[in-house]
Amino acid sequence: VENLTYEMFYHLVTEFPHTNTNPSQNRPAQQFELAVRYLENNYTYNCTIEDLCVSLSLSRSYIYNLFQKFAHTSPQKLLTQMRMEDAKSKLTSSNQSIQEIADLVGYHDTFTFSKAFKRYSGYSPSTYRKHFS
């Protein structure tokens, strides 16, 4: 299940860099694209924003500025959104335990996952599964 916000990020990543022909002005857009791709490829692991910064050799403040400029959100919020949308999908389409789903979306502590999921969706994972399966 993809929501409208995730689709917006996908659109930004796939379309925005092609709208500017000046390579020096494209650099931040390309860095943003790389950052989003990194999160898409690694959100299922216990990756952090620090891991993203190290991977791209960029400072934390620069990464946050990129996300504010191109996505009007923080990288942490996008990372959480990716994890929670995947968790919502898994909760409604599989019989995997909440612990297994937490592990699959990058949380290795079920309590932390459950708190984050409730904050994101308004439901505990088990309640969400019951209501939306």
Regions found by a protein language model. Give the residues of each.
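Terminal helix-turn-helix DNA-binding modules in bacterial transcription factors
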Residues: 36-37, 41, 46, 50, ...
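Core residues of bacterial helix-turn-helix
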Residues: 55-56, 105-106, 117
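Feature detects amphipathic, helix-rich regulatory segments
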Residues: 123, 127-129
